[in-house]
Amino acid sequence: MIKKIHSLEKAVVFAFNLEGWDLIHTGETCLPFDAQGTTPKGRKAVIEMKFREKYYETKILEVSKYNALINLDTDIEKFYYVQDPKANYLFWLNELIDLQKQELYCPNTTMWNKSKRNKNVYLLTEEQARIINPNTNADTET
């Protein structure tokens, strides 16, 4: 499973680089993001990525992940990329304000433990995404 996720992350990095970004994949490290480099405008940037097999109207961002990213140097642009069956979403975390923390019963983040626990999360709406690229033939009813 982790190899598949890393392959998806690398594919996203490749696609972004085709659009003028200069990113390297960091998903195999213990850093709180999956890619780092510069935007097409030359600004320092990091991207955290999530790949969802099921479509949900809101996109979950764990408060701990958000805090780890937003507390990086202020000259770094922080992005959250979500891919689901409907579309690909890019959230610019630097501009999100007044996020409302919620507690949800979610799966543990470890692959070795199938248990669930309460997590503090932000629920991001699709309207908050900076860029949305619809997936063709998306089936959101699954």
Describe every region a protein language model picked out.
Residues 35-37, 41-55:
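Conserved catalytic cores of phosphodiester-cleaving nucleases, focusing on short active-site segments
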Residues 90-142:
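Intrinsically disordered, low-complexity terminal regions enriched in charged/polar residues
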Residues 53-64:
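Active-site-adjacent loop/helix micro-motif of nuclease/hydrolase catalytic cores
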Residues 70-98:
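Nucleic-acid nuclease catalytic cores
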Residues 31:
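Beta-rich catalytic cores
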Residues 1-27:
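Acidic-basic catalytic patches of nuclease active cores, encompassing PD-(D/E)XK
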Residues 25, 46, 79-83:
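A structural signal for short, well-ordered beta-strand segments and their strand-loop junctions
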